[in-house]
A protein has these predicted regions:
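Short amphipathic beta-strand segments in non-cytosolic proteins
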Residues: 47-64
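Beta-strand-rich domain onsets/edges
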Residues: 13-44, 52, 134-140
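Short, surface-exposed loop/turn segments at beta-strand-coil junctions that are enriched for proline
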Residues: 81-85
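Glycine-centered loop-to-beta-strand initiation motif
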Residues: 69-80
Length: 140
């Protein structure tokens, strides 16, 4: 009987595991990453700050969150999905320290990407960059 309970428990865990992983990745509405195109690798250890534009005072930005890119150059946990996140946001990527660590001078001390969030869809706002250029797009 004990053996049967153990097998049943393992089956239940294996069945529920994919749902818990999906729930964790979808619990945040905004993610980002940086790809260093000069190396073809993720940019690890870059500080990023998220701001939201104050709708009543359009010249003021409110800091919402900060993070540092992981080994894959990603931050996946900006903006919890349980809130209404409609608004205009800015991701500020502090890229200069990343390039200085590699012995490179960058023309961009930081990169600011401004975008709008509407509804409950997930937004992935990555940048691809080198010390002398960058590009952005809405990913998924």
């Amino acid at each position: 009987m004990t053996q049967l309970i153990k097998k049943f428990s393992v089956i239940i865990i294996l069945f529920l595991l994919p749902f818990s992983i999906y729930a964790q990745t979808e619990s945040h509405q905004l993610s980002t990453h940086i790809l260093d195109i000069s190396k073809g690798e993720p940019a690890q250890g870059v500080d990023i700050t998220l701001y939201k534009l104050n709708p009543s005072t359009p010249s003021q930005w409110k800091q919402i969150a900060t993070g540092k890119t992981d080994i894959n150059g990603r931050i996946s946990n900006f903006l919890p999905s349980i809130e209404d996140n409609t608004g205009i946001y800015m991701l500020k990527f502090y890229t200069e320290p990343y390039f200085l660590k590699q012995g490179l001078k960058s023309i961009y001390p930081f990169v600011e990407v401004i975008f709008r969030i509407e509804g409950k869809k997930h937004y992935h706002i990555p940048i691809t960059m080198s010390a002398n250029g960058y590009s952005t797009y809405r990913g998924n």
